[in-house]
């Protein structure tokens, strides 16, 4: 377990720093430029990178996982140094923070699937694996919450150079935690990437066929595309909303992220603790949680229109908390239903196909957020998208 703890703590600092740096970058870039196009571009790159995580999965199967983890974290350190060099050499804080965040997004193509697969390659025995996974889950939740706090420190200084220096210290700490880690892992198979891509494509097509034949699953696909588009469009508008509408509260963007994260954790906790013998968390009630997600987004737009800034701030933060809860519960109910409604040997293919389809709307949302911001005010856009989400959920009731 000693090796596992080293990896978990390293991942904790890496995830914490990466999340805080992204939040700070979005806030800082919009505050300086007041141009939504920069936020859209960063969001687009991040979302496109997510679509290619299967490549990172193949690479993590082909290369020694511990060695690959050291390499990726080491590149993060060098990348942050590069950002500092750009900042001081060209005196361009926007370029320096954008380059750093973009390269980190590309690194996540490998890092995300690698951290998911490295634990089973090291632990021995079912009990150790369960214990290790519980530690990983706790560390991930804690880093997600604390990243909002760390980004608040970055925002307090409001300086890219200071933000990158603090990030560099934490990335170096993340690297030092694994630098002496033995590269010995369970023997893996030599992976032919071309063969795996072909197999993955075939699995995706098989998953698609099952989805088309299963009404319970297929009915939600178009609805999810609409809701994902609306959510990501709204989320990418949050730096703009925080700065343009709630300029009196410097830490509004951090509060929004923290509220959403805490809501997601509370939703998962509620299902885990209360689902036995309760009729609230059943597949039958999934449409209501979907409808409530749209309502929460609508309320965010509504509270943003209030004349009282304090009332608006409290309302928006609470609405994001509510959205996090409803989204978390809804996701658990839906994917649990999927797992129960398809043969066990097809679950992976079906869920993989569903996640791929759902994510197709994300880059479109990133592209759309900038032109939408020129049409009308941000609160009106958010209110309208919340209304669309609520209307999109109606067919699921039937």
Where are these regions (language model features)?
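The feature captures the transmembrane alpha-helix scaffold of multi-pass secondary transporters
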Residues: 8, 36, 40, 94-102, ...
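Extracellular/periplasmic helix-loop-helix junction of adjacent transmembrane segments
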Residues: 24-49
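Transmembrane alpha-helix termini and helix-breaking/packing motifs in multi-pass membrane transporters
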Residues: 26-32, 84, 88-89, 146-166, ...
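Helix-loop junctions on the cytosolic side of multi-pass membrane transporters
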Residues: 164, 168-195, 397-398
